[in-house]
Amino acid sequence: NRMPKLNVEQNVNKNAIFPEEKAESVFFKRKFIKTAIKKIEAMENKGIFISRQDALLDGIRINASNILWTGGVETWKKLAAKGYWINGTSDSLGKNNEPPCTLFDDLDWLNFTHDRNQEKSSMEKFISYELTPKEDEIKIKDKQYFYWMSGSAFQYALELYPNIIEANHACGLGASYDIIDRQISGKVVPFLNYEDWKHQITADTDE
């Protein structure tokens, strides 16, 4: 399958893109589920897959028999800064490039995720945090170019404004791409990151 390319008109007005700044893209409050701590600390011989740092609170004692694997390098860095030893990463290549389960076939793999995750996965889900929509108004209905930081943000925005499905959509090379591409197959364009997308889409405009 050939990757779709971004259909960029020259001189895209910054008022037509979302988000203009990264902070605008946060639609949810993320809250760790405290009752998960004892369950996590009791885990042994598990492969733990984490795609967001929110899935693991600071200071949880992870048994040494477990393997910790992240969805990307950024999550690795953030969890390492919290003091966790990370065994490897899928380097933002998404769930299609899941942890190398065949290398650790004696482990049961768990995907630490949030309560709104409806995605099918070869891994069992372990719900470790909740997503609560923020009360701020999301001003996106007149936007034409979108970069999505997460699949759940795209799905939530689509519920609020179904017409945005006709716009130009982009996201990173991770699980978000898999989720969004399933909904608008062949119409979402992957980028290395938000900055890469913003640079390309506004390259011909006056700063």
Each model region followed by its residue ranges:
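Signature of uroporphyrinogen-III synthase
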Residues: 1-207
